[in-house]
Swiss-Prot record:
Keyword hit for Lipoprotein: yes
Lineage: Eukaryota, Metazoa, Chordata, Craniata, Vertebrata
Free-text description of this protein's post-translational modifications in UniProt: Phosphorylated at Tyr-14 by ABL1 in response to oxidative stress.
Encoding gene per record: CAV1
Positions carrying N6-acetyllysine: 5
Name of the protein in question: Caveolin-1
Membrane topology label: Peripheral membrane protein
Site of covalent link Glycyl lysine isopeptide (Lys-Gly) (interchain with G-Cter in ubiquitin): 5, 26, 30, 39, 47, 57
Positions of region (Interaction with CAVIN3): 82-94
């Protein structure tokens, strides 16, 4: 089989691989591609948004999922007319639905802009200020921690060891008096 040539799906002519890993001149051929998992890279700015499930991480499950029954309830024995109850339900639901849409139409884009700027600033400060300060602090504190450790081992360890030996000889007996 060595010395044979074949054409792959892309129309390239090359010799039959003489190794299990594939042809060294084209290492990512089909036999190797099955062995090596390839990661597909996606740009975060071009991802598609889901117009049906707009809360995929369930951020607002407990907070703003308010229905008519969560706000208005009539206890047993105190009921209004059925027509009033149905009209109240419809009024509440439709008002909440359309007023939310109106507010999101008026304020959604400006607030998205403000929150985008805020989180961009927050990310920038975290990446370029907070993390470097913490890393710098940890590097500087290592020197102090070594000196502190030497002082503890030099002065405190013998003192506490001596106190431990003194108190290790104390014996207590408990007697129950009747």
């Amino acid at each position: 089989m060595s010395g044979g040539k074949y054409v792959d799906a892309e129309g390239l002519l090359y010799s039959v691989p003489s190794r299990d890993q594939g042809n060294i001149y084209k290492p990512h051929n089909k036999t190797m591609a099955d062995d090596l998992p390839e990661k597909q890279l996606y740009d975060a700015h071009t991802k598609e948004i889901d117009l049906v499930n707009r809360d995929p991480k369930h951020l607002n499950d407990d907070v703003v999922k308010i229905d008519f029954e969560d706000v208005i309830a009539e206890p047993e024995g105190t009921h209004s007319f059925d027509g009033i109850w149905k009209a109240s339900f419809t009024t509440f639901t439709v008002t909440k639905y359309w007023f939310y849409r109106l507010l999101s139409a008026l304020l959604g884009i400006p607030l998205a802009l403000l929150w985008g700027i805020y989180f961009a600033i927050l990310s920038f400060l975290h990446i370029w200020a907070v993390v470097p300060c913490i890393r710098s602090y940890l590097i500087e504190i290592q020197c102090i921690s070594r000196v502190y450790s030497i002082c503890i081992h030099t002065f405190c360890d013998p003192l506490f060891e001596a106190i431990g030996k003194v108190f290790s000889n104390i014996r207590a007996t408990v007697q129950k008096e009747i």
